[in-house]
Amino acid sequence: MTREKLLYLETFGCQMNVSDSEKIAALLKGIGYFPTQDSSQADLVILNTCSVRAKAEEKVYNHLVQYKGLKRKKPGIILGVGGCVAQQEGERLLANVPHLDIVFGTHNLHLLPELVRAAEKGERLAEVGFIDNETRLDLFPVDERTDGVSRFVTVMQGCENFCSYCIVPYVRGREISRRSADILGEVRGMAGNGVKEVTLLGQNVNSYGLKSSGEMSFIALLREVSLIPGIERIRFTTSHPKDFSQPLIDCFAEIPKLCRHIHLPAQSGSNAVLAAMNRGYTREEYLGSIARLKAACPSIQITGDIIVGFPGETEEDFQATLSLMEEVRYTDVFSFIYSKRPETKAAGYADEVGQDEKQGRLSRLLDLQRRITLETNKSFVGTVQQVLIEGESRRGGQFYGRTSGNRVVNLAADVSLVGSIVNVMITRGDQNSLQGELCR
């Protein structure tokens, strides 16, 4: 009997990459590769990569060095790299990494089965061409998994904002929206398999449908998804603050299934830095959107992204960022030290902030956010929250779930409750999660 072939798939970076990895796994299952958690047992290793920051890119190259030894022990193993590093480097990756077999870009996932078949015959190939056609976003097997209660659904890909620091437009391409009929069909299929929560994904979901003649708007898409039986919660990410309209804000008050959480990246609280970043809004405009959002939905939980040490950022600029964080009261912030990215406008900016200063500012920012997060989590103690139970917690004998506001809750529960939304009394607020008890 022939042994089934094994796939080890490692994902770096954002939720879009997580979604892409799910597609990769489904495609490769179609040609006989099944997942393993042990890379040493794999016949095929795929790294789905991120290049949004230099540190993420360095991590990929470090992993490729580690796989050189595995390739030596198992010469027949196939090693592939996809995602944003692959899109950025293309043929150079094959030239610089002799033990690499396949390079495929962000627009070429659907070609992966034939690339693997070619690699099985000893060929080394790179496919990184952009395909400006929405049909490529639907060239994937139907998701037939019955595990998990929460899924990602890609609604669009690409970005045309060209923030001065950001490589995404260069590695994900121009904005392309999927057909709404295909999106709704995918969500209906997921609902039929027991999925209760979907997260609609795009680099800038606000732009959904704007370039597609006759296609519905993102707001209309949200409303259509909310009508699908079985889907009890809807999330979306990411929104660009300059496009965050009042009609979209109103959806948080008008669509009961839309979760009370929004990820709205500010990147900085300084108008001078925001202008240099080409963000397209001011501090005042951002805070105005936050105020309107809180007025429409007082229970909204807000997360964001912050970059520290952008070229020319002064101590005064940094203090403006800290004061913005205090005013918004983010429940979490993803914060990063600025790093130059190839092809971006900011890569040519002078007035670099020193590395020690960057690190010091990041530490101060993290200290502030930890305080705000802990205060926020403690404020939930004594309240009853609706929690979607997702699975077993790493804490022995407990399960975990999320509130509508995206706070993780650990609690004693029964496996029969996985996939159910239950009322939970919050008994403790910790730094990274909440502790609760089922309301009987």
Swiss-Prot record:
The protein's enzyme class: transferase
Entry-linked Pfam families: Radical_SAM (PF04055), TRAM (PF01938), UPF0004 (PF00919)
Cofactor binding mode and count: Binds 2 [4Fe-4S] clusters. One cluster is coordinated with 3 cysteines and an exchangeable S-adenosyl-L-methionine.
Superkingdom of origin organism: Bacteria
Positions of [4Fe-4S] cluster 2 binding: 159, 163, 166
Cofactor(s) needed: [4Fe-4S] cluster
Family annotation (InterPro entries): Elp3/MiaA/NifB-like_rSAM (IPR006638), Methylthiotransferase (IPR005839), Methylthiotransferase_CS (IPR020612), Methylthiotransferase_N (IPR013848), Methylthiotransferase_N_sf (IPR038135), MiaB_methiolase (IPR006463), rSAM (IPR007197), rSAM_horseshoe (IPR023404)
Boundaries of every Radical SAM core domain copy: 145-375
SMART domains reported in the protein's UniProt record: Elp3
EC numbers: 2.8.4.3
UniProt keyword terms in alphabetical order: 4Fe-4S, Cytoplasm, Iron, Iron-sulfur, Metal-binding, S-adenosyl-L-methionine, Transferase, tRNA processing
A GO-annotated cellular component: cytosol
Amino acids binding [4Fe-4S] cluster 1: 14, 50, 84
GO molecular function, one term: metal ion binding
Location of the protein in the cell: Cytoplasm
Keyword Hydrolase: no
Cysteines joined through disulfide linkages: none
Catalytic activity, as annotated: N(6)-dimethylallyladenosine(37) in tRNA + (sulfur carrier)-SH + AH2 + 2 S-adenosyl-L-methionine = 2-methylsulfanyl-N(6)-dimethylallyladenosine(37) in tRNA + (sulfur carrier)-H + 5'-deoxyadenosine + L-methionine + A + S-adenosyl-L-homocysteine + 2 H(+)
UniProt similarity note: Belongs to the methylthiotransferase family. MiaB subfamily.
Function: Catalyzes the methylthiolation of N6-(dimethylallyl)adenosine (i(6)A), leading to the formation of 2-methylthio-N6-(dimethylallyl)adenosine (ms(2)i(6)A) at position 37 in tRNAs that read codons beginning with uridine.
Full protein name: tRNA-2-methylthio-N(6)-dimethylallyladenosine synthase
Gene encoding the protein: miaB
